[in-house]
């Protein structure tokens, strides 16, 4: 039996660490939290200074029994849960269950799961930091008080299964506020004039800028006609040439929030998927002869700090690969409000390149690792240098301007460009070499009518970014928050953008009227600040809870008395039940909308809502191909005669047969491109627009 017992959260992490520590250490997993507040009751005694009642989580009995058995036999027990508040709380709960000494230096933390980092952490064990535990306890108790007080009111007055919470209610508010902006938006007409100009054999474009040396707004067609009427022929003169050198710095390495945003934009990953794959990379990948190694640092962080060791290694890689001129000379600065002493998300070793790791990784693991690796290495590279040119092109009182840009030195852009910045403005726009006084010819003057557009709906990436900018919640809360408002059917995704549902708007209105603090951004931000102060030891968690609950309790009492019951009418489905003849209605279930008999519970008939795509089933030639959704909300295509016909396709059949093998053709989408391919052979053709 090993003298030392080490407890971590997951089997994958346990497996990796045990290989590093050797035979004197036994590493086992707690499988996450082992204690929590009970689900069947509040679990917080508001009459006894908010004392929490912790119980062993249902189903964790065998795990706890196993932990106690090993702890009894070990000389030393080390708690090696994750290096954040949640991990500190897990360590504390384990310490209580195993009856370890409070003052024992048995807590070990490491930011990356590599041999050196793990061994070093065991040389410096410390006591459990109760300030961090208390900050996590305060968050948990706050969320319990909010959820278990508001939810029953919503169940009683609106509909069963609803919920509200400090972060999810603010996230829902953001989506609804944006929708109201869009509804209330009044488009305004405006015009632009673009000119195409020729100098010798070169052509370039410029936009109308000034009339009589002043900006002139083109609000109507009359304004445009005033400008075009003032033009005299096609000859223009270059009246000013401005040349500048512009430096562009690389983005910082990833935090949790920026990783979720960039993975959504570049890889089309949902926040939850990003965190799941990142956890796999952090906990350890089997590299065969090299053993199991954690490929990235801890993925729940809002710090952009980088260790000196990592900087040195990155500089060495960049120098060897690109040359000395590509290494960064600037000093990276941390972000205000970084939680604890974490690092940014980075590869545990720059020398483990994505290409070298590809054969050991799944497709998703490789794509995310490549993104993290490239972003980090680019952050340690030299800035890009751009040459910009601005030309003023004048005829009389009318001035056009052309802007051009060329890359003089690519620097970090050799490796990586952040998606949000990868726009038209960054693309090289070469202008002919012109000097003041040169003459150019206008080959085309093109007015165009436009209308102002409403603000766009939130994508998942933009919602995460906004939550972070407003300091709502923590990096670890973004993914579950977005998950919750979708599962509750408060919002739905349309073209990858969030739209509030009728139910979401009803719930929001009730919470807004009776629990205004819960959806108040400033209140939520202040609460996060107080949680930080608890972690720093500046205030007690009980004082923070009491400051909130004393007024919140009155809001709950008022809501119970005054909130009116809301009837959410079922939407008619437009057809009758084939069993009893009663009208069918649209219901919302766990996996979306479905049809149910209005005569429930006497008749329990239900049907999936299907949408015909106007194509006959290629298998039975009798049914129609209909669009369906899987339990994971992924669209697929099946036969309307199911279960008699079991035809299924992830790609959309188009109603034509392959000219090579006579099997059915499908529409296949990859990223932004769509093509028609054969479901059987290698035939393909361009999709018709």
UniProtKB/Swiss-Prot annotation:
- Kindly state a single biological-process term from the GO annotations of this entry: DNA topological change
Domain Toprim, chain residue ranges per copy:
3-113
Determine if Zinc is one of this entry's keywords. Answer: yes
Binding locations of Mg(2+): 9, 82
- Which Gene Ontology cellular component annotation is one that this UniProt entry carries? chromosome
Please give the cofactor(s) recorded in the UniProt entry for this protein: Mg(2+)
The enzyme's E.C. designation:
5.6.2.1
Q: Where is the Topo IA-type catalytic domain?
A: 129-557
Pfam families linked: Topoisom_bac, Toprim, Zn_ribbon_Top1
UniProt site (Interaction with DNA)? 33, 139-140, 143, 148, 155, 300, 488
Q: Which residues form the active site?
A: 298 (o-(5'-phospho-dna)-tyrosine intermediate)
Enzyme class per UniProt:
isomerase
- Name the catalysed reactions: ATP-independent breakage of single-stranded DNA, followed by passage and rejoining
Per the record, which residues fall in region Disordered?
328-356
One GO MF term: zinc ion binding
Q: What SUPFAM superfamilies does this protein's entry cite? A: Prokaryotic type I DNA topoisomerase
Q: Which UniProt keywords apply?
A: DNA-binding, Isomerase, Magnesium, Metal-binding, Repeat, Topoisomerase, Zinc, Zinc-finger
Q: Where are the zinc fingers (C4-type)?
A: 577-603, 617-645, 658-681
| Superkingdom | Bacteria
**Stretch list, region Interaction with DNA:** 163-168
Q: Which family does it belong to?
A: Belongs to the type IA topoisomerase family.
Q: How does it assemble?
A: Monomer.
Quote the function comment for this protein.
Releases the supercoiling and torsional tension of DNA, which is introduced during the DNA replication and transcription, by transiently cleaving and rejoining one strand of the DNA duplex. Introduces a single-strand break via transesterification at a target site in duplex DNA. The scissile phosphodiester is attacked by the catalytic tyrosine of the enzyme, resulting in the formation of a DNA-(5'-phosphotyrosyl)-enzyme intermediate and the expulsion of a 3'-OH DNA strand. The free DNA strand then undergoes passage around the unbroken strand, thus removing DNA supercoils.
**UniProt xrefs under HAMAP family:** Topoisom_1_prok
Name of the featured protein: DNA topoisomerase 1
Gene this chain is encoded by: topA
